[in-house]
UniProtKB/Swiss-Prot annotation:
This is T-complex protein 1 subunit gamma. It comes from Pongo abelii. ATP binds at residues 42, 94-96, 411, 482, 497. CDD domains: TCP1_gamma. It is an enzyme of class 3 (hydrolase). Its EC number is 3.6.1.-.
Amino acid sequence: MMGHRPVLVLSQNTKRESGRKVQSGNINAAKTIADIIRTCLGPKSMMKMLLDPMGGIVMTNDGNAILREIQVQHPAAKSMVEISRTQDEEVGDGTTSVIILAGEMLSVAEHFLEQQMHPTVVISAYRKALDDMISTLKKISIPVDINDSDMMLNIINSSITTKAISRWSSLACNIALDAVKMVQFEENGRKEIDIKKYARVEKIPGGIIEDSCVLRGVMINKDVTHPRMRRYIKNPRIVLLDSSLEYKKGESQTDIEITREEDFTRILQMEEEYIQQLCEDIIQLKPDVVITEKGISDLAQHYLMRANITAIRRVRKTDNNRIARACGARIVSRPEELREDDVGTGAGLLEIKKIGDEYFTFITDCKDPKACTILLRGASKEILSEVERNLQDAMQVCRNVLLDPQLVPGGGASEMAVAHALTEKSKAMTGVEQWPYRAVAQALEVIPRTLIQNCGASTIRLLTSLRAKHTQENCETWGVNGETGTLVDMKELGIWEPLAVKLQTYKTAVETAVLLLRIDDIVSGHKKKGDDQSRQGGAPDAGQE
C-alpha cells in the first residue's frame, strides 16, 4: 500500500496562490493603484512628489509619470502601471482616467465573485457592455472643423486646465497648436503627424515661462568648430553629412612597414590629400554651413574656414533628421556623392547664441518647416519637466483631433451619458448577465464622482442630480464643472475631449479588468538567498499563469 506522502510538483522555493484568494488579491492591487492616482483627476487635482532611487525629485499630477516612478511588486499592479503607459503611447492623454476606471471596473466585479458568480459570466457581460459603450460614445460625438483655430484652442485648453501649466494656458495652447500644425505632413491623402520625432522640446533653465516659444526650425546645443567661422548667416545653404571629415582609419588593425624616411612623409601627405579632396567635394557646391554627425579634423576645419564655411560637428542623428526636414536638405553619407539638390536652402537664418553658459545653434525662419523646436524657459528643472509633460499631452490631444476630428463632452458628461444608456439597455436584458452589465454603468460614474470629490463638493447630492439630469431629453452634455463642483452644460463651458482618447480609455480599462478577472493562479518564484543578499530591495520576480 502506498504511503500518503505529499507529491511535490512545484519547486519548494515557489509560492502558489489560487482561486478566490488570487482574484481578490488582484482586485485589491488594482484598487490600491487607482487610489494613488484618484486625487490627480480634474482641474483641482493634487500633485505628487516622488523621489527616485538616485535622489532626483519628480513633481507631477500626470498619471503615467507617477506610476512610472513607483516601484510595484504585485503582478496585477504591474499590469495596471503598464496600461497607463499604453494609454500614454497610443493617445497621450487620459492616463489618469484609465487607471481609475479599470480599478472601479474590478471593484464592482468583486461583489459578483463573492456571490460565487463565475468570472466568465462577468467577462462576457463586460464585453457586451464595451460594445455598447463604444456605439453610445459615437452617437453622442460631434464633428469638429479642424481649421477653426478658436475651437482647436478650446479643445487643447480642456486638456491643459487639469495640469500645472493651466496658469499659462493660452500660451501653452498656442505653442501646442503651432507645433503640431508645423510637423503635420500630408502625402497621397495620408496624414502623418509625428510629434516624438519632429517636435523636439528643449528645456533651458532660466528666464520665465512666458519666454517659451515655438521656433520655425531647429535649435541644437552646439557651437562652431573653429573660432573664426561665421556665427550669423542669412539664407544659409546647408549641407548635412553623416560621415566624418577625418582621415579614414582601417576597419581592423592596420600595420604599415616603412623602410625609407620619404615613405613616412608620403603617408602623411596622402592623409592630407584625402582630407583636402573631401573638403573640395563639399566646397564646390558653395555651401555656407556643413553639419555632420561625426568628427571634423583640424585640417578639414582649416580648409572649410578658408572657404568661409561654418562647420558644426557631432550632431545627434535625430537632430540631423529634424534639420533635414526643416530646411529641405538631404543627409549624405559620402561627400563625393554630394549634388546640388542635396543642399538645403529652406532656412532663413543661422545664428549662434549664448544662453546661460552654453552656446546654441539656431536654424530658424524656415520657409516650409516640417520640423520644429519648442523652447521652454522656467525657474527650475523640476518645473520645466512638468511643463514639458503637460505640453506633450496638449500636443497629443491636438494630434488626435487633427487625425480624427470627433469630439465628446468632457467633465464626466460622456461617462454619465454612456452609463445612462447602459442602465436603460440592461432593463431589457434577462438572465444573470444583466447584473454585471449594469455594474459597468455604475463603474463609469466614478469619473464624475472623483471630479466632485476633488473639488470638495457634496458627492451624493450632485451625482443624484446629474443622474436625474441625464434621464431628460438632450441633456447628454451635462457634467461637472471641475473648478467649482457645480453641474453645467459642457457645450456652454466649452469642455470637449477627442473621441479617440475616450474610446481608447474605455477599451483599455475594460480589457484590463477582463484580463485580471481571468487570472485564477499566481505562481511566484522566490530568489535564492545568496541572490537576495546581493540585490537587496529588488522586488521578487512574479510570473503569472
